Structure formats: structure tokens, C-alpha cells
């Protein structure tokens, strides 16, 4: 159970210890033991993973710094150890569950297994945690992932001079995360706790999503510790009569974009039920594209049935800039609306004169026609008389005589 040849490795960062118990790199004192609720330092799981210092105890799991002897590299091990219903008795490796929580514990453990097996299947996605092993042991379940270094989005924003960033910069950060969210939702996984603290800006340029836990940690009606994040927790997570859905993550994700663009957290969801105003200072609003503001409005609707319902829909709204819409229109014809009754054909005004107003009465028209006929007849008669009365010929003879 214990690996002797790791005695000279730091149990926090796994760098070699040069002298003494304090790591010169991370400052961890290796004489410090884990609390008795957790497994001791240098415990080995699966004859492969050496457990180090406990980094955190989250709602559903203890998170250990660890070392993978097969890969000869640090890793992170999550042990399903839900707060309030399970612990570990001193000297025992097996997890101890309070009897009245046994049934719930078994259900939560299945949820934990499903969550991390799904994460392992999706580990190649840009924003996903690189999980590579899930296994049962010690009456519980463990999930192993590669360590992910990065700066939380909240910390990054606080380092900027204004406390917020322009949309063009935010777009590069956020849009790949939507692809990962969409894949998770397609597999039935709801994150339920997306915040600026759980979005990591990594050295490789990717933004990764951390803070995953089973869904039961993200609703008030659960036996487990509720992960409340004011401004980011959706109204359905406060309400026993509503269930989480993909729109729950859309709300939190939109709130993160709002924080990045505006520089402050949105109001918490319960307060918005009585005062639903998301104020953006004019100076900032002028720099945010109109279609992005509309997309945030769709993502931050209080009630889930009124929100953008999927990551794909939110992506469409965020991409709805006029130039993007024009490009999309060239690539594919949009759905055509149902045909409507067409009005009677109109004359082509480009090639014909406008129709003239009709006479008021048919009698006037007949009179005019008769007059025209009479005039034409009179003229014809006059020509006949003149031509055959000798006047023309006499005029010609006179001309000839004068010559």
C-alpha cells in the first residue's frame, strides 16, 4: 500500500526534495499528514497511483495531488467522498457511510461513476478535463485526470486595467467551451456550477472547464452540500419544483460572458424575480455588439423555459453579427415560409405607361367617335371636290404658262 521510493518526492508537487521535509519549489511541508478522513500520504491505488496531499474537499469528492507510476508523471485523483453522508474512520481505507444515507450514497456513487466515465470519453474536447481512468476501490469510486494548470477567468479579469475585456477577445475564449458543453449535454451531463472561477485560461491557449460534480450537488433539495454561486446559479437550482436542464448551464455560461464584458456579476436569480434589470453602463454597452447583448438577454432569462435552450442556440445568437448572417445566407438558403396568397399581377411600370383614367360615361365616348368620323368624312369629301373640280389642274396650267 505504501511506496517507499517516493520518500524523497514532494507529496504536493512531486518534485525531488533536496534537503529536509519542506519543498523548495512549492513550500509544502511533507511531514504534514492528510486529515484522518482522507487516505494517508503515499497510499497506492491500483498498484499505480501514489496519493499525495489533499488539494480540496468538494461537495462530492476529495481531490488528491497524485503521481502516476506508469506514466511517471503527476496526476489528479478524485475520490468519491460526499460531505455530510460519508467519511473515513481513523486507520481504515474503506469509506464509511451513515446508515440512513446508504441508499442515497449508492445512487450518488452511480452518478459519480457515470459522470467521470463520460468525461473520460470526451477528454479530447478542447474545454474538457483530460480524464483517463475511472475505477472502484475502498467501497467508493476514483477518477484520474491529468493536472491542468491555468489562471481562473475571474483572476484574469481582475488583472486587466478595466476589469473587463472586449467581445472580440472574449469570443475567442468562450466559443470553444460551447462545443464542449454541447457534447456534455448530448450525453446527459449538466455541469451545474459554471463560474469565472471554474473557467481556466491555460498556457496552451485553451479555456478548460473544471468544477465538475454530480448533479445532486447543484440543487437545494439534495442531501449533499449545495454549490451556491450568486449571480451564476439559475433559479431552478433554488426551486425544489424545477429540474436542472441544459438551459441551467446556458444561464451560468451567459453570466460568465456578462462578467467578462461588463466587469461585474449579474444580480442573483432570486432577486431578479422581483427586479429583472440587467444594467450595463452606457460606456460599456456602446462597445458591445448589439447581437451579443441580445444573446445575453436570451441566455439570462430568469425562467428556463424562456431561455436559449441549448449551447447550439446560444452559439447561433452569439454569431448573429450582420456579416456572419450574410455569409451564412450565401452558404445555404434559409427555410422558406409557408406560401401566402399573391395579389393580382400589376403592370410593369418600367415598361409601360400608367393606365389612363377612364371616361366617366360611355355616351361621351360614342359622341366623340361619331364626331371624329364626321370630320374625317368631311375632309375626304373636300379633298375629292378640290381634286376633281379643275382648280388644281388650272393652277398647274397657269404655272406652266408663266414659264
Predicted feature residues:
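ATP-binding glycine-rich loop module of kinase domains
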Residues: 38, 69-113, 117-118
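Protein kinase glycine-rich loop
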Residues: 52-58, 63
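Activation-segment/catalytic-loop signature of the eukaryotic protein kinase fold
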Residues: 133-134
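Conserved short submotifs of the Hanks-type protein kinase catalytic core
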Residues: 137-152, 156
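AlphaC helix of the protein kinase catalytic domain
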Residues: 153-165
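Activation segment signature within eukaryotic-like protein kinase domains
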Residues: 173-174
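Catalytic-loop of the protein kinase fold
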Residues: 181, 185-202
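C-terminal lobe helix-coil module of Hanks-type protein kinase domains
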Residues: 230-326
Amino acid at each position: 500500500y505504501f511506496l517507499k521510493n517516493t520518500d524523497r518526492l514532494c507529496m504536493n508537487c512531486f518534485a525531488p526534495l533536496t534537503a529536509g521535509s519542506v519543498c523548495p519549489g512549492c513550500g509544502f511541508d511533507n511531514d504534514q499528514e492528510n486529515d484522518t478522513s482522507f487516505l494517508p500520504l503515499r497510499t497506492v491505488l491500483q498498484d499505480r497511483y501514489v496519493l499525495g496531499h489533499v488539494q480540496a474537499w468538494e461537495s462530492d469528492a476529495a481531490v488528491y495531488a497524485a503521481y502516476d507510476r506508469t506514466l511517471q508523471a503527476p496526476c489528479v485523483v478524485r475520490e468519491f467522498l460526499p460531505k455530510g453522508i460519508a467519511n473515513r474512520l481513523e486507520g481504515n481505507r474503506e469509506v464509511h457511510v451513515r446508515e440512513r444515507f446508504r441508499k442515497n450514497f449508492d445512487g450518488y456513487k452511480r452518478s459519480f461513476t457515470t459522470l467521470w466515465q463520460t468525461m473520460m470519453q470526451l477528454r479530447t474536447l478542447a474545454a474538457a478535463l483530460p480524464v483517463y481512468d475511472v475505477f472502484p476501490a475502498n467501497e467508493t469510486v476514483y477518477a484520474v485526470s491529468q493536472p491542468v494548470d491555468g489562471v481562473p477567468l475571474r483572476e484574469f479579469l481582475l488583472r486587466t486595467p478595466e476589469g473587463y475585456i472586449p467581445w472580440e477577445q472574449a469570443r475567442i475564449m468562450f466559443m470553444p467551451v460551447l462545443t464542449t458543453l454541447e457534447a456534455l449535454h448530448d450525453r446527459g451531463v449538466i455541469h451545474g456550477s459554471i463560474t469565472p472561477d471554474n473557467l481556466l485560461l491555460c498556457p496552451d491557449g485553451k479555456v478548460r472547464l473544471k468544477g465538475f460534480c454530480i448533479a445532486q450537488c447543484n440543487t437545494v433539495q439534495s442531501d449533499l452540500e449545495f454549490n451556491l454561486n450568486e449571480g451564476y446559479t439559475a433559479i431552478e437550482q433554488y426551486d425544489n419544483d424545477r429540474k436542472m436542464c441544459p438551459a441551467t448551464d446556458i444561464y451560468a455560461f451567459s453570466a460568465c460572458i456578462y462578467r467578462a464584458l461588463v466587469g461585474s456579476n449579474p444580480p442573483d436569480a432570486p432577486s431578479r424575480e422581483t427586479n429583472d434589470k440587467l444594467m450595463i453602463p452606457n460606456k460599456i454597452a456602446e462597445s458591445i455588439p448589439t447581437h451579443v447583448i441580445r444573446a445575453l438577454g436570451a441566455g439570462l432569462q430568469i425562467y428556463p423555459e424562456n431561455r436559449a435552450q441549448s449551447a447550439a442556440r446560444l452559439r447561433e445568437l452569439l454569431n448573429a453579427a450582420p456579416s456572419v448572417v450574410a455569409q451564412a445566407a450565401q452558404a445555404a438558403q434559409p427555410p422558406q415560409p409557408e406560401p401566402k396568397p399573391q395579389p393580382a399581377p400589376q403592370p410593369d411600370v418600367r415598361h409601360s405607361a400608367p393606365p389612363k383614367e377612364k371616361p366617366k360615361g360611355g355616351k361621351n365616348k360614342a359622341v366623340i367617335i361619331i364626331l371624329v368620323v364626321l370630320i374625317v368624312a368631311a375632309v375626304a369629301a373636300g379633298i375629292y371636290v378640290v381634286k376633281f373640280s379643275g382648280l388644281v389642274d388650272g393652277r398647274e396650267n397657269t404655272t406652266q404658262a408663266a414659264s
